[in-house]
């Protein structure tokens, strides 16, 4: 992005300024795509993108699909690696109301995603939690979920 209101530099962090600024342009790390109608859609942050089965996966796209399930109140998707070092996605899900997590519900949620996205984007694992870790401003703390995915 660029414009008259763009920042000049990061205060006392010249390395970050050098990585972020390209002349008049600012590299935000946000990823978008333009559809056939000319509308732009947000895909998430570049540093949140996952490479699963050699293909890029946007956690935001998977999360939006998860949120379409009637029992899902909140969702966050992060990457994990298996014992062979292969990457896969893990969905952390907060359920609505008095719904309780089960293997059957996890399978149903994955089937729901499978009807909306290609197979490599379907989470290999669904973890149910009471709440997602968030900052005081409500942003999901993905680093905490990534740590949980390794356990």
For each of these PLM feature ranges, what is it?
Residues 3, 8-12, 16-19, 23, ...:
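AMP-binding/adenylate-forming catalytic core of the ANL superfamily
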């Amino acid at each position: 992005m660029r414009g008259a209101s763009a920042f000049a530099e990061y205060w006392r962090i010249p390395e970050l300024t050098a990585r972020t600024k390209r002349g008049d342009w600012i590299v935000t790390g946000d990823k978008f795509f333009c559809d056939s109608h000319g509308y732009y859609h947000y895909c998430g942050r570049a540093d949140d993108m996952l490479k699963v089965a050699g293909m890029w996966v946007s956690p935001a796209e998977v999360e939006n699909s998860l949120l379409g399930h009637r029992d899902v109140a909140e969702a966050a998707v992060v990457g994990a690696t298996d014992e062979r070092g292969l990457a896969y996605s893990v969905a952390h899900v907060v359920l609505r109301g008095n719904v309780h997590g089960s293997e059957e519900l996890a399978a149903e949620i994955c089937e729901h995603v499978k009807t909306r996205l290609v197979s490599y984007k379907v989470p290999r694992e669904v973890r149910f939690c009471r709440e997602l870790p968030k900052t005081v401003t409500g942003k999901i703390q993905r680093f905490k979920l990534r740590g949980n995915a390794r356990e």
